Amino acid sequence: MKIKKTAGRQPAPNRINEEITGVPEVRLTGIDGEAIGVVSIRDAQNLADEAGVDLVEISPNAEPPVCRIMDYGKFLFDKAKSAKEQKKKQKQVQVKEIKFRPGTDENDYQVKLRNLIRFLEDGDKAKITLRFRGREMAHQNLGMDLLNRIKADLDEYAVVESFPKMEGRQAIMVLAPKKK
């Protein structure tokens, strides 16, 4: 037995023209959206042919099925275009990471703080990683003080999503932008 494969094509979501079978009559809507009424399937296809467009089954489960006279290619194009616009409007939230050390100097701290503010204003989350090396592990309280200082400095821009916690040799805190 041979298995029939469709080469990546998905079936059309709506039946069109001659694909609409098994129903004697349909509820028809015209090109401009005006209701024509219940007509036989043959009359509906003739009206669509006269207009030079397609007969598209909109609601197959209705009784009788609802069909519309329209340009199906244009309909699919507009549908794809609107879906693309919706996707474009969605903002993908990213997590930006800034790395600190317990001995980060004041100027470096201010530069990294400005970057954090910029990330949060753009609507992205910020992950703050504080890495301890060597003997710095003995002074974890200095690192936690630094994370608390960052939290206090960014209080008007962000809310803490995950509070500072140690993971191996680093302390991690995640900030999310405040809702406006």
UniProtKB/Swiss-Prot annotation:
One GO biological process term:
ribosome disassembly
**Pfam families cross-referenced by the UniProt entry:** IF3_C (PF00707), IF3_N (PF05198)
For this protein, the record's PROSITE patterns field holds:
IF3
Localization per record:
Cytoplasm
Q: What is its main location?
A: cytoplasm
Which GO cellular component terms, listed alphabetically, does the Swiss-Prot or TrEMBL entry include? Answer: cytosol; membrane
Which keywords describe this protein according to UniProt?
Cytoplasm, Initiation factor, Protein biosynthesis
Q: Which InterPro entries match?
A: T_IF-3_C_sf, T_IF-3_N_sf, Translation_initiation_fac3_CS, Translation_initiation_fac_3, Translation_initiation_fac_3_C, Translation_initiation_fac_3_N
Q: Does the keyword section mention Hydrolase? A: no
The answer to whether keyword Cytoplasm applies is yes
Molecular function, one GO term: translation initiation factor activity
Q: PANTHER family, from UniProt? A: TRANSLATION INITIATION FACTOR IF-3, TRANSLATION INITIATION FACTOR IF-3, MITOCHONDRIAL
NCBIfam families to which the protein is assigned, alphabetical: infC
Q: What is the documented function of this protein?
A: IF-3 binds to the 30S ribosomal subunit and shifts the equilibrium between 70S ribosomes and their 50S and 30S subunits in favor of the free subunits, thus enhancing the availability of 30S subunits on which protein synthesis initiation begins.
Subunit-structure text: Monomer.
Question: Of which family is this protein a member?
Answer: Belongs to the IF-3 family.
Looking up HAMAP family in the UniProt record yields: IF_3 (MF_00080)
- Name-wise, this protein is Translation initiation factor IF-3
Gene name of the record: infC
